[in-house]
């Protein structure tokens, strides 16, 4: 259990890693636009980590777009030579998943971002439902809760939107993601020196990442934040990053584009 629970010094390092990671993710978000190369966005993230005082990235940034956001192509995009770079195109979504390293401790944070700066109507509805489910799941995180319990709350919130979902994409997403076997990479993982599978019940004092990963109709949806588990709940360690489609569009609209 000790490997999962951080002492005060370790938590200070994780807080610093989280803070610099927020800066790096926003920098990456601001660099995304039609025609930009995946590698350019990744280099912006790497530079932002260093410029904010971190020791670079703790893993190579993920900024896959389009079909490369869907398993297994997202992993291929990291590992195979013919998928290592791609020009981003309007209408695509980007999986932006980044982390800065501070004194060997990991930051880890992510959002799903529209290349054009605007979601399509069906992407917007689907993403906002995904976000609502995320917030519901995050709200139950506390000491003693299991990963399966958090998933069931997330799932229940998805299903609550089924009757009012308007687009075929959102309806298909809810029907698919509400079956556990269709979201095999939906996860909560421990974060400190390395990412790791958490114990059966989350202990107080552990830093975790809440990271639902899902896809539907060739589009990936991904959201991730860092939390400190306490007896009363979970403290968000990565505040300051927009969630909803409208908030993300506003952030991208007012970004100073390179």
Where do the protein language model's features map onto the residues?
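Active-site neighborhoods and metal-handling regions in enzymes and metal-associated proteins
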Residues: 1-258
